[in-house]
Amino acid sequence: MSAPTIPGLEGNAPTTNQDMLNWIAECAELCQPDKVVFCDGSDEEWEAIAKDLVEKGTLIKLNEEKRPNSYLASSDPADVARVESRTFICSKTEDGAGPTNNWRDPDEMRAEMSEHFKGSMKGRTMYVVPFCMGPITDPDPKLGIELTDSGYVVMSMRIMTRMGKEALDKIGDGPFVKGLHSVGAPLEPGQEDVKWPCNETKYITQFPEDRVIWSYGSGYGGNAILAKKCYALRIASVMAKDEGWMAEHMLILKLISPEGKAYHICAAFPSQCGKTNLAMIQPTIPGWKAEVIGDDIAWLHFGDDGRLYAVNPENGFFGVAPGTNYKSNPNAMKTMEAGNNIFTNVALTDDGDVWWEGLENEPDHLIDWKGKDWTPDEDCLSSHPNSRYCVPIEQCPVAAPEFNDPKGVPVDAILFGGRRPDTVPLVTEAIDWQHATFIGATLASGQTAAAAEAKVGTLRYDPMAMLPFIGYNVGDYLQHWLDIGKKGGDKLPKVFLVNWFRRGDDGRFLWPGFGENSRVLKWIVDRIEGRVDAKKTVVGYTAYSKDIDIDGLDTDPKDVKAALTAPADKWQMDLSDTEDWLKSLGPKVPQEIWDEFDFLKTRIKTANKDGNKALDNMKTK
């Protein structure tokens, strides 16, 4: 079969993959770019695209001495974050998407979006970006191609994925996930471009059965860097369900004991709950070390030994900048020091460096993220709250070598955690995998309904921290978790619920957090090794305060004890919200989850009547 003509392609395509060539030709005919370029991932390509974007004003080259090979982008104020209201799961049936996703008929959506894509790349270059999810050496890799008219996306994809010629060669004549992205800002001949092209109309659309992603109108982060949430979670979660593995919104941490034994921990936290800080934690306990394998996404699969193994499908960190500093996350700061960064929507200093809220040494003058002069007297922030740094993992001083191992690492523990000022103890072990699935399904941040100034319904539920990212029906997703539990049996990792944000009656944080969270991780290791007991509470097996190592810590032991309480009366107040939440997830919520809800109610009733001691004598969970 002869290769199709790709409008705008100079020379021959560096592939013979007929399906790929046909698809690129179709998209080029639809979007009408001036030219089509296959990306090879080289330094020369990076430099050429960066030079072009600097000339257009999209990027500012930072001070080479302070930030080598690094750039600052400032987006349109209307294009600063993921747009969940414009994110669609276009499964073949509405039931396939379920109640937590926006669904549209896939044929109707294709027709509607095709009208927007028609001519959307006029005056621009269509970049063909081949990429590999996870280590390029994986014998069975997950691959993809993103077609985009954004050089910013190409540069970001080079950091966030294994991108370029190697990935294209890996695809060969095989299958791949197809991603089409346009900022939706065509240029007529002679028309001057804007610094950050985008469109008021936005779509971020996944077609899960077809393994296809279409994104239109946004140039920002997760909307445009299609390998991130679109592929690594929404599409991958469907692939995982079909193939018997898991795609989860989890960090992967390697913790090394003083004896040199390594433990691998995955953790799922909703946003603003300290996930990136935990991923790059610096333990404060003598003799303990930590290394990072991933800060955001984990793909979990069963190894030949029957254990769950975790792989990070990404190659970079795409972190929230504000609040990141040498106290909260020194390793992230050191990673950025090495250069090769793309910063987005942070402030520019007078000497060509970057700054954001929470960083040390506030300057007297900045250019803010909107390009305006800024001083500390301003009543606005210098950096957008969702401003970002994008940097290669390999630069992190505590990057574990295993982040490049396609086998992944055996998972010893999974952590769930929200931001709860009350009710949830500092650390609790789940009773079993079914109970763990219930804990994940009802993961929440916020206050109980009876808390000061709180209203009923102020708990924000985020199952497994995956609410915006489950690519199919949430009930089926929970069933998949239960099925994994049945398959894994006694080789499954232990699961824990943590809460770094417990406050006292006076509003103070009871636990110092940050690097001191290593003390909680030590207790988790002690549980894995069977070295410590735990007390049964309404939430599970909660730590005794005496077993949390606070040696050398300037924290009142009474505060630690208070942080480890699970007051049954407070848990009672959560029940109505939790029941409403589970009902809202529809009829596909597995019966086992409702059984766990009934067990929770029984534990609360028993504890309220006879105290926590009575829980030890219960015949049921």
Swiss-Prot record:
**Where does the source fall among the domains of life?**
Bacteria
The cross-references to InterPro entries, in alphabetical order and at most eight, read: PEP_carboxykinase_C, PEP_carboxykinase_GTP, PEP_carboxykinase_GTP_C, PEP_carboxykinase_GTP_N, PEP_carboxykinase_N
Which processes are annotated in GO (biological process)?
cellular response to glucose stimulus; gluconeogenesis; glycerol biosynthetic process from pyruvate; oxaloacetate metabolic process; propionate catabolic process; response to lipid; response to starvation
What's its catalytic activity?
oxaloacetate + GTP = phosphoenolpyruvate + GDP + CO2
Instruction: Give a GO cellular-component term.
Output: cytosol
Q: How is the cofactor bound?
A: Binds 1 Mn(2+) ion per subunit.
Query: Per UniProt, where does GTP bind?
Result: 272-277, 388, 419, 514-517
State if Cytoplasm is listed as a keyword. yes
Task: Tell me which EC number(s) this protein carries.
Answer: 4.1.1.32
Q: Which residues bind substrate?
A: 82, 220-222, 271, 386-388
Q: Where in the cell is it found?
A: Cytoplasm
Residue positions annotated to bind Mn(2+) are: 229, 249, 296
Positions in coiled-coil regions: none
Its pathway, per UniProt, is: Carbohydrate biosynthesis; gluconeogenesis
Which UniProt keyword terms apply here?
A: Cytoplasm, Decarboxylase, Gluconeogenesis, GTP-binding, Lyase, Manganese, Metal-binding, Nucleotide-binding
Cofactor list: Mn(2+)
Recorded GO MF terms: GTP binding; manganese ion binding; phosphoenolpyruvate carboxykinase (GTP) activity
Q: Where is the active site?
A: 273
Family according to the record: Belongs to the phosphoenolpyruvate carboxykinase [GTP] family.
Q: Name the NCBIfam families for this protein.
A: PRK04210.1 (NF003253)
Q: How does it assemble?
A: Monomer.
Q: What is the stated purpose of this protein? A: Catalyzes the conversion of oxaloacetate (OAA) to phosphoenolpyruvate (PEP), the rate-limiting step in the metabolic pathway that produces glucose from lactate and other precursors derived from the citric acid cycle.
- What name is this protein filed under? Phosphoenolpyruvate carboxykinase [GTP]
